[in-house]
């Protein structure tokens, strides 16, 4: 079964750059789980985000994410795993923030 893992962390932690030890941990995670990881990436900070809504046929664009929270969506993985717990159990970012696990919908 496929799951989308949404990694939420406080992006202020990265304002002065990424900790080399954490980067190595993510690289090791990626290498160890390469057969399960189908895709993923880190995201630019929320200052680069835009929210788009279409109302009455017109696109309305606002700067930033929809919600203001202490933790922001910082990255994602698309993985193959037997269940939700197995999907997110070893994500390094779970120690600093949280990982939302969403099953991928299949259409037959």
Positions of the model-derived regions?
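Conserved, structured core segments of small domains
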Residues: 1-108
